[in-house]
Amino acid sequence: MHPFLTALIFLTTLPVRPRANAQPAPLSRAAPWFPLVGLLLGGLLTGAAAALGALFPPLLAAVLLTAVWAALTGGLHLDGLADCCDGLLAPVSAQRRLEIMKDPRMGSFAGIGLILFLLLKVFALLSLPPGAGGWAALLLAPTLARWLVLWLALQPQARPAGLGAALAEGLQKPALLAAFLPVGLAAALGGWRGAAALLLGAAAAWLILRAAKARLGGVTGDVMGLCIEMVELVTLLTFAARIPPL
């Protein structure tokens, strides 16, 4: 199976039908295709936003677009965000935090975190500028997030046999640089806000890495999910902010 199809199956719920007996590519080979999958998601979200905006009032359209966003990814990254809320915020040891994050039950921190996050996402979508600025935000958010998660995969892992280790195995920095192409394209469409989103998204990923190292001893798959969700939100907020151009 082509690595792009493996990435598409791993990151989305899109109905991909590989050939019979086709074996998925190793995750490390699929990883450089993550940003391109993000760009595809951004294109689908842009189309969904246009359709929903034409059919419904703005607030309802923003809520429905948030639901479409979650449906396209199967809630995979929201699950990581919820687990990180429970684990990273618990006043316990690093080992106990890792155990909490593997527990399928959702704690109070996860519930509160998910509610606040989804409210922020809905109102960030509602506040996006009309036209090209809003489309650029929807294209860049999932693309940048899935590029920065590759950088996280190259950092120390809290679980040697976890998702991060599978992603990092064989992943080289030249592949990481090549994977930036769709990110650069999407950022260019956003003008100065696109450039600002690159910087702020990278800062968010760095802060998440620092917290993961301090509280868990390294990165996990849940931390990567948290990174994707937070970078997407930061990107949307950057485009929604009422800041005059420089």
Where are the regions a protein language model picked out?
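Hydrophobic alpha-helical transmembrane segments
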Residues: 1-74, 90, 95-98, 103-246
